[in-house]
């Protein structure tokens, strides 16, 4: 968790760790952070009531709105389309390598990208926390207690964190009422909602590409059930995309 990010976020009055000490030990720099009690929302999601999910969603969107106002400037070459292209390129390479899923799904999403190009071209480099999905968002006794593992701050469309969370919940075979509450707080218009569904599809193929991969000493599990579940999620999302045009 880089110090400069915590320093930037410290002005937002949001529940993040406090830097207690920093220093250098040998060739390594280190931070000692305050402890925040709680567990990842994905680990306790089944225990949350609808009212608790709604309150958490309200607080998360309020946090994102605060983060959007920090002074963080994008590189001159920043372009939101590069983010999308990079995600799809990575997923395509992985799916080709492991061959658990139909590579034509990438081509399908690229066609949707063209249909959404006018919207994507207008996305500005707005700061937001892009990795608070089913992890990194701590819950204690049904309440939001903190945000951890902030390795970077996203720049672009805040709807991506909602899309990532939705696909993660679907992949865990959990309900998505929390997503409904997040969207209720964000109030996306018709075009923004289409973009949200598009981002869900992008993250879906990203999840597909990870299946069977080796990360350090961990292999991402893959079997017929997992393959079917992700294929089904993709199909449901495509149906939703098509309904956006009805």
What kind of feature is each model-predicted range?
Residues 49-50, 146, 163-165, 221-226:
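Glycine-rich, phosphate-binding/catalytic loops in enzymes
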Residues 29, 111-162:
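Active-site acidic catalytic loop and adjacent metal/ATP-binding pocket
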Residues 10, 20, 45, 141, ...:
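Short, flexible helix/strand-to-coil boundary loops that buttress conserved ligand/catalytic motifs
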Residues 102-106, 188-196:
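Short, surface-exposed acidic
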Residues 37, 53, 57-58, 65, ...:
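An alpha-helical support segment within catalytic cores of ATP-dependent transferases
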Residues 159-191, 200-219, 229:
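Active-site activation/catalytic loop segments of kinase-like enzymes and analogous catalytic loops
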Residues 1-78:
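ATP-binding pocket architecture of kinase catalytic cores
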């Amino acid at each position: 968790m880089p110090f400069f990010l915590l320093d930037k976020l410290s002005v937002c009055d949001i529940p993040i760790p406090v830097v207690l000490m920093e220093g250098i030990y040998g060739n390594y720099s280190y931070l000692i952070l305050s402890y925040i009690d709680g567990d990842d929302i994905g680990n306790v999601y089944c225990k949350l009531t609808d009212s608790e999910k709604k309150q958490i969603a309200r607080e998360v969107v309020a946090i994102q709105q605060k983060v959007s106002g920090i002074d963080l400037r994008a590189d001159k070459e920043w372009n939101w389309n590069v983010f999308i292209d990079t995600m799809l390129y990575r997923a395509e390479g992985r799916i080709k390598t492991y061959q658990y899923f139909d590579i034509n799904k990438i081509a399908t999403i690229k066609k949707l990208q063209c249909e959404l190009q006018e919207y994507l071209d207008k996305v500005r480099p707005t700061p937001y926390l892009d990795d608070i999905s089913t992890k990194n968002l701590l819950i204690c006794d049904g309440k939001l207690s903190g945000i951890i593992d902030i390795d970077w701050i996203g720049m672009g469309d805040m709807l991506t964190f909602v899309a990532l969370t939705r696909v993660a919940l679907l992949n865990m075979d959990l309900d998505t009422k929390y997503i409904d509450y997040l969207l209720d707080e964000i109030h996306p218009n018709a075009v923004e909602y289409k973009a949200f569904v598009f981002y869900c599809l992008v993250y879906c193929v990203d999840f597909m590409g990870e299946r069977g991969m080796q990360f350090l000493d961990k292999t991402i599990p893959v079997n017929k059930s997992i393959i079917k579940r992700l294929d089904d999620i993709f199909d449901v999302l495509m149906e939703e995309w098509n309904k956006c045009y009805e």
